[in-house]
């Protein structure tokens, strides 16, 4: 395979123009192969990724036809098929992430983009399953075979993680529509109570996602910022539940830990409003909170970014997926400001609870994580074409997901 092939970080694979396989396949396949090579020279926008899927599927179908008609299961052919299928799965992953980002940016929790994103992820996972079930992955040596199997395993975990992340981000979108609708300067008791009913469930999703993400480190999805993001949300959601249980000291402790995780992601200046909340000027506090919730991330801010483009939040070594950064800027940070104000006001005037700062004690209150398995779309190869269940075309007919 390729250097560092055991990780998904370098995906999609690039084909060599001087590969030995060009002497083993007919001219029409060489043309399709060159099209694949050229496709990776373009950007990774949604339209380009769809083009890549079409281009690489045609090459894969040609390879599969050649394999079966010529009864050619040579290691080079098998390895090329594996590379092509893995790349198509990666393109589906890219489109799934981008569509998820667009769904969140649309500010409508009920739009079809959530469903479309899940469909793309299912198709990508389905190709990984198709490759694992239908091929012995005969490669030049056992080491290369293990590399392919390890990549398939890591990609499967990443697809599962992205499905879980989709549910978490959808939850944030729903919460955003409830809280920021009137740009309130404070949450009414019934609003916090309503949030508390689902906050533990959302925390369980974050904990489950964190567990899955721990198995995906070093790949193309998970990094330290991703892990801090999930931890921050976990503490944030659990703080709401503790507040509703009249455990204001624990709620503040949970929120403080959430803020610590945020400070590993965003610059201190982005959270400077938290310091202003210590002011005794009530009017200033309320104006600040209103301003936080009225801020909007304009669609053009991240619109033209590539899915894995390195966007620097605050240092040359720190990068973050646009989807995660958008949810932080647009909702999580303003919500944190709002909750801290509410928790502190309640504790200083009514509860008088000692703030819990022992992280080990806070973690003892964590519920068991919740994970949801994603089933990949069933693919098959018939009459020279790769198709999935209930479809005659590999780029249309989106199904249900969230």
From Swiss-Prot:
Top-rank lineage group of the source organism: Eukaryota
GO cellular component terms given for this protein: cytoplasm; nucleus; plasma membrane
InterPro entries per record: DUF5355
Gene Ontology BP terms: negative regulation of transcription by RNA polymerase II; nuclear-transcribed mRNA catabolic process, non-stop decay
Name of the protein described by the UniProt record: Uncharacterized protein YGR122W
UniProt source species: Saccharomyces cerevisiae (strain ATCC 204508 / S288c) (Baker's yeast)
Phylogenetic placement of the source organism: Eukaryota, Fungi, Dikarya, Ascomycota, Saccharomycotina
